[in-house]
Amino acid sequence: MSINKNIARLRRAKSTRSHIRELGVARLSVLRTGQHLYAQVFTADGSKVIAAANTLQADVKDGLKNGKNSDAAVKVGKLIAERAKAAGIEKVAFDRSGYRYHGRIKALADAAREGGLQF
């Protein structure tokens, strides 16, 4: 039985999100596309976005050739940490949305940790 790559990723993401929901902490969710990277911090119940950052924003785009490399992920990670801390969030659960913890996803997570978020 063959499974589409995206369907398998979404299945992994669904499982991860159910575990995070049981923890009852804010969730740092990441979406990776071919051209850009998006990060959002949701409330513990998932009903409201507390902070958001992505590679389309002007303050992230400055000094970058494109939004699809690890340098862009580092900028997004630092920015999301700064915005989450400004909103009063110190501790989050990292939701990698079924992506491998490698490359841009790892760079974003490491930058968010350096920015002061605790996973």
UniProtKB/Swiss-Prot annotation:
Function: This is one of the proteins that bind and probably mediate the attachment of the 5S RNA into the large ribosomal subunit, where it forms part of the central protuberance.
Molecular function terms from GO: 5S rRNA binding; structural constituent of ribosome
Name assigned to this protein: Large ribosomal subunit protein uL18
Listed GO biological process terms: translation
Provenance organism: Xanthomonas oryzae pv. oryzae (strain KACC10331 / KXO85)
Pfam families, sorted: Ribosomal_L18p
Presence of the UniProt keyword Transmembrane in the record: no
Family of this protein: Belongs to the universal ribosomal protein uL18 family.
GO cellular-component term (any): cytosolic large ribosomal subunit
